[in-house]
Amino acid sequence: METCLFCAIQRGAQPPKGGVLYEDDLVYAHHGDFDEGPTYLGHVMVETKRHTPEFADLTCDEARAVGLLIARMSRALKVCTGAERVYATFYGEVTPHLHVHLTARYAGTPAAYLRWNVEDWPDAPRGNADAVRALCERLRSALAAAGRGEI
């Protein structure tokens, strides 16, 4: 779809700072690039390749692929960031292309910043494009290790 942000990212028109974390025929993952300034480190987007708005529209193969990638990427985020928890959120309101936000929740995150406003914590780990690229390289390595059964 021409105007869809995630379709544009996947076809290379808007490449993510950290590059592609994972891609196959059904799913795609990249680190979120939401801010002009320092980026929250550990916010990964898992998307369907096919432009489809919600879970109810998935084929069984797509649903399996999304679920498996969420699990693998969550483990990789915990290993690479030291996160205590990885939040998975889906709203489907702004961009009608199925995507799940995986967000690392770091140790010491105050209770006021738990759940949906975790990225508002002023002391949360943030970084420039180089820091995002470095984290993404570690995430790709962790995903490769997971594929070999190492994590």
Positions of PLM-derived features:
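HIT superfamily nucleotide-processing domains
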Residues: 1-151
